[in-house]
Amino acid sequence: MADYKHPLRVGVGGPVGSGKTALLEALCKAMRDQYQLAVVTNDIYTKEDQRILTEAGALEPDRIVGVETGGCPHTAIREDASMNLAAVETLSEKFGNLDLIFVESGGDNLSATFSPELADLTIYVIDVAEGEKIPRKGGPGITKSDFLVINKTDLAPYVGASLEVMERDTNRMRGERPWTFTNLKVGDGLNKIIGFLEDKGMLKV
């Protein structure tokens, strides 16, 4: 029997460039004084996201582990999550008292989902720059994730996207499932995500 605490595992997915790594940096910096955190990043051929988070000082370097998937990023979080599961276990054993581990997927499409063996909760990140039509395109990330983030609201005027249309379509596609707009440059929407993690992840129990 494992003699370490089993942390909450939160999968963070979304297309390339949507802001997954920026979200993790913001969440880590906002939560690290209150909770014991770690991060597993996924990249196909490099450990670029691990490097970005480390250089940004999101957490201590040994709390951030990069996984090189060497293939489809979807496979590494769904069909064969063994490398990620091993990384989660290694971090859990190393620190013993982790409250939460974020698992960031490599950039993927709207159909990407996390194996329930790997993630207890899932956050899916899209961004306004992809166009206001993205929420109504659906896909498991949009409709089934535990929390949806629509990032880069500050870009809406520059790409001709209506936040009102995106809000309407998102509410229609998600029903009662929670979501928020974010502008991570200034921290807009971050507290709502943290509140969700604390509530649904039972971090404060």
Curated annotation (Swiss-Prot):
Kindly name one Pfam family recorded for this protein.
Answer: cobW
Look up the domain of life of the source: Bacteria
Alphabetically ordered keywords of this record: Chaperone, Cytoplasm, GTP-binding, Nickel insertion, Nucleotide-binding
GO CC list? cytoplasm
* InterPro entries linked to this entry: CobW/HypB/UreG_nucleotide-bd (IPR003495), P-loop_NTPase (IPR027417), UreG (IPR004400)
Cellular location(s): Cytoplasm
The UniProt record lists the keyword Nucleotide-binding: yes
Where, by residue number, does GTP bind?
Answer: G14, P15, V16, G17, S18, G19, K20, T21
GO molecular function, a single term: GTPase activity
Name the GO terms of the biological process aspect. Answer: urea catabolic process
Which NCBIfam families does the record cross-reference, listed alphabetically? ureG
Subunit architecture:
Homodimer. UreD, UreF and UreG form a complex that acts as a GTP-hydrolysis-dependent molecular chaperone, activating the urease apoprotein by helping to assemble the nickel containing metallocenter of UreC. The UreE protein probably delivers the nickel.
What does this protein's UniProt record list under function? Answer: Facilitates the functional incorporation of the urease nickel metallocenter. This process requires GTP hydrolysis, probably effectuated by UreG.
UniProt record similarity statement: Belongs to the SIMIBI class G3E GTPase family. UreG subfamily.
From the Swiss-Prot or TrEMBL record, give the protein name. Answer: Urease accessory protein UreG
